[in-house]
């Protein structure tokens, strides 16, 4: 006997799925892309404002997708299922490997409220002072702020693609007033 898996987001009633004019349209100009991106962020903001939504589950799932994208950037073959298994099957004292470490960075970054301390915990190879400096590099509207943080990190540490994307997502979340990092940018860059 098989059971249908419950879909907690569809049970909420508000808000419904992404409007078709956002998800089916193709941006032909920079203005279109800007508009559709803003509309998608606005819709996500409504989901994150809904108290009944499983925020931690959403962030964890997006963190897995972001880790998968970052692992692919580095040329590694691991995909979401292997990353998930690598993390969940770790025994005390085991090392997760490079791909597993990337996955852990994203999960740690998304699970705690935004702060330099939480980001330093998620990115153990980066000093808290450096995180604060990069975070402060972003000024302006939310997407511009995220882009400036990404640019600042990659100009100082060109091989730190995953940490750069984590910090850019943190800047975006902070600018939008979200209490937690929501992994969005890495999957979009892939």
Language model features with spans:
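FIC/Doc superfamily catalytic core
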Residues: 1-190
């Amino acid at each position: 006997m098989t059971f249908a898996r419950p879909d907690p987001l569809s049970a909420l009633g508000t808000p419904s799925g992404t409007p078709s004019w956002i998800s089916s349209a193709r941006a032909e100009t920079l203005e279109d892309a800007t508009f559709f991106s803003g509309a998608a962020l606005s819709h996500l903001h409504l989901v994150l404002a809904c108290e009944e939504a499983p925020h931690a589950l959403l962030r964890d799932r997006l963190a897995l997708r972001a880790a998968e994208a970052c692992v692919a950037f580095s040329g590694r073959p691991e995909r979401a299922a292997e990353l998930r298994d690598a993390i969940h099957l770790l025994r005390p004292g085991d090392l997760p490997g490079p791909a597993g470490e990337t996955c852990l960075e994203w999960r740690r970054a998304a699970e705690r409220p935004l702060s330099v301390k939480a980001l330093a915990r998620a990115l153990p190879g980066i000093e808290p002072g450096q995180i604060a400096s990069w975070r402060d590099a972003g000024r302006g509207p939310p997407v511009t702020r995220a882009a400036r943080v990404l640019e600042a990190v990659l100009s100082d540490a060109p091989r730190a693609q995953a940490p750069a994307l984590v910090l850019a997502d943190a800047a975006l979340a902070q600018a939008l007033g979200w209490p937690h990092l929501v992994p969005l940018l890495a999957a979009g860059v892939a």
